[in-house]
Amino acid sequence: MVMLLRARCFQRLAIPDPMRVLYKDYRTATPQNFSNYESMKQDFKIEIPEYFNFAKDVLDQWTNMEKAGKRLSNPAFWWIDGNGEELRWSFEELGLLSRKFANILTEACSLQRGDRVMVILPKIPEWWLANVACLRTGTVLIPGTTQLTQKDILYRLQSSKAKCIITDDTLAPAVDAVAAKCENLHSKLIVSQHSREGWGNLKEMMKYASDSHTCVDTKHDEMMAIYFTSGTTGPPKMIGHTHSSFGLGLSVNGRFWLDLIASDVMWNTSDTGWAKSAWSSVFSPWTQGACVFAHYLPRFESTSILQTLSKFPITVFCSAPTAYRMLVQNDMSSYKFNSLKHCVSAGEPINPEVMEQWRKKTGLDIYEGYGQTETVLICGNFKGMKIKPGSMGKPSPAFDVKILDENGATLPPGQEGDIALQVLPERPFGLFTHYVDNPSKTASTLRGSFYITGDRGYMDEDGYFWFVARSDDIILSSGYRIGPFEVESALIEHPSIAESAVVSSPDPIRGEVVKAFIVLNPDYKSHDQEQLKKEIQEHVKKTTAPYKYPRKVEFIEELPKTVSGKVKRNELRKKEWVTT
């Protein structure tokens, strides 16, 4: 097996408080300030202990602090649904319930340390319990989005060799349809009010399970979770994360980008199948002792999101750019966000126009962050720093970020190249270990002493990084290199456009030209489309460099997206090049 890097191990730290694995001076009430960014980055260091388990070394320590009266009385977990149901857990209650769940995994399901558990659940409390139970037992969590089809589930079960699956009534039939083809699968748990043949009913089992359980003493570099990529350029690949790469690594997100303290209430709207849920719905807030807030909505409803932000004491809000684009289309004048103090976005670049609309309507900036399923936060806009709209910000304390050419040489400010992370001589702790069962893919990401992210960008004179495109999204037209994001940002400023995606399209003269696939706002669907195309093209010429305007425009009802919500530009691009 090709490993991306070999971690440098430290001896187990002889410290009285495991919290100090994460940082020297534990904060309960003092937010960060990045006005002195260079000093903050230079002083940051986390020593990785030989053994680390997030459930034992973080969550259980918060329980101890609760019992000692050293933590505020706000819940550790706060869940609501759309029907008026509400649930709150302290860290002590979270610990008790997760120990019961852990006993179900080890006793009823006969799972052992290192066995793999696929969890496909919506935003219900059992999803969080499953996460912590896997940590306690040393089993490997494999999250999946509830949008997976029967074919998707079969592929993931077979590829991962999962021995157990946990899901609900909606997807249980799909699992049953493929289970016979999955030779490693021997346990099925369902979250349901009803029994189902061949399945253990988790709700019933939780009633009788013991709450006495000894957490497995995991080494920091043991596999903790496997995440499937979105699969925008081929079949999904398995990304391996360890107890330190996420369990310790995501402390960077919580401490610096999210700027969380123990009194905060953090709401992240990401789907449970995304690594972003691990980022902002599990590790980052709980590292800081903050409350994880969750709202179970069967589908995204912008008015429900705004009502929740207004009604509940949410202080930190995280959502995808698409969500912000939908939210700002609402009349928000009747909503009051008295508790909200910090808003962040990640997953794809967010358009400056959307950031400005959000600021005008809420009085709050959106702090964009950049990372991958393979990493924790790579770059971010941090509190106290000047925000440059459209920029990914500056490197997080976890990484040394460079822009490289194809030979591995570092490029000067202003020149576009590959976004890369230095991995030698010392491995950064917030980075995945390898693509599981895919050594050639793992090896392909290395260029000298750097991990190549697969994204293109540049750094400006002030040290801010700017995203251009995925490497395979770059458009080469008449000698010009054009990234889709800048064109899409110009397009979204036109009032007729709800969403857009820009790809290359073949042209006999220029080789390639920019083509825009556009989803119109409802009020513009009856307009003359030829006239509207011309208006949009002229708008882009005036908004960005004229050579970047879309010479081809096609109006469509919806954009193709992955199960994690990212636009599948490769599908649109393939359509152009195969059919032309």
From Swiss-Prot:
Record SUPFAM superfamilies: Acetyl-CoA synthetase-like (SSF56801)
Catalytic reaction equation(s): a medium-chain fatty acid + ATP + CoA = a medium-chain fatty acyl-CoA + AMP + diphosphate; propanoate + ATP + CoA = propanoyl-CoA + AMP + diphosphate; butanoate + ATP + CoA = butanoyl-CoA + AMP + diphosphate; 2-methylpropanoate + ATP + CoA = 2-methylpropanoyl-CoA + AMP + diphosphate
InterPro entries attached here? AMP-bd_C (IPR025110), AMP-bd_C_sf (IPR045851), AMP-binding_CS (IPR020845), AMP-dep_synth/lig_dom (IPR000873), ANL_N_sf (IPR042099), Mitochondrial_ACSM (IPR051087)
The record places the transit peptide at 1-21
Leader sequence residues: none
Compartments in which it is found: Mitochondrion; Mitochondrion matrix
Which GO terms label this protein's molecular function in UniProt? 2-methylbutanoate-CoA ligase activity; ATP binding; fatty acid ligase activity; medium-chain fatty acid-CoA ligase activity; metal ion binding; propionate CoA-transferase activity; propionate-CoA ligase activity
What's the top EC group for this one?
ligase
Task: Provide the E.C. number(s) assigned to this enzyme.
Answer: 6.2.1.2, 6.2.1.17
Q: Name one Pfam family in it.
A: AMP-binding_C
**Key words of the record:** Acetylation, ATP-binding, Fatty acid metabolism, Ligase, Lipid metabolism, Magnesium, Metal-binding, Mitochondrion, Nucleotide-binding, Transit peptide
Amino acids binding ATP: 229-237, 368-373, 455, 470, 566
Q: Which cofactor does it need?
A: Mg(2+); Mn(2+)
Function of the protein? Catalyzes the activation of fatty acids by CoA to produce an acyl-CoA, the first step in fatty acid metabolism. Capable of activating medium-chain fatty acids with a preference for isobutyrate among fatty acids with 2-6 carbon atoms.
What's the name of the protein?
Acyl-coenzyme A synthetase ACSM3, mitochondrial
